[in-house]
Amino acid sequence: MPSKPSKVLIIVARRYNGNELWTTLGALVSRGHSFTIASMALEIVDEVTGQHNLIKTLVEATLEIEYDALMVISGNMEDTEAYWTMPHVQSLVGDFYTAKKPIAAICCSVPTVRLAAKGKKVSYFPLMRSKELLERAGALPQPVSITVDGNLVTAENQMGSQVWAEAFCDVLEGKDPNIHLVDFGFRPGKRERKPMPQLERLKAITKATGRTRVK
């Protein structure tokens, strides 16, 4: 454990991703760190379960100097994208970056921290508009699910929440996250479809009998 536990500011979408948030809070608490959750409203909602939660901090009222690190949690796309351009949030990211404090973002929240990603590798949810924003900021998008580059920790999607949160705790504690991921080279695009014998037989039967269901 670090000699001094970190106090982490967690910015969440108003309609937040519950898997990302609760997994992150569990990791921070288990490692002895404290946190403050901030959002654009004091009532936030799990976008999947509809569970409402009351918090005490509006994101507009937060200051970098009061925290040791910053994390950004995604959720509803409209709410998540709002932080990409919200002046106070972008100013916060810049302040944390200038102060050399650890920063983490996951899924569609990664473009929110692009000001801290110049010259750094990042994982991100593969939307073209996300990639364009990141590249314009000088970030280096990666085709792997989780990336740690210095004190910046990013993840592609919620499936990596636990590893992402634990890796960030390692960074907070001055430890090597020890994440080794491999790019298998897959890229979405057009490719020749190979015929499937079973499907071709089914199509032939359907065409011959005029039936759409085969027993």
Identify the residue ranges that each predicted region occupies:
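Extended, subdomain-level signal for the structured scaffold at the beginning of enzyme domains
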Residues: 1-103, 111-123, 128-215
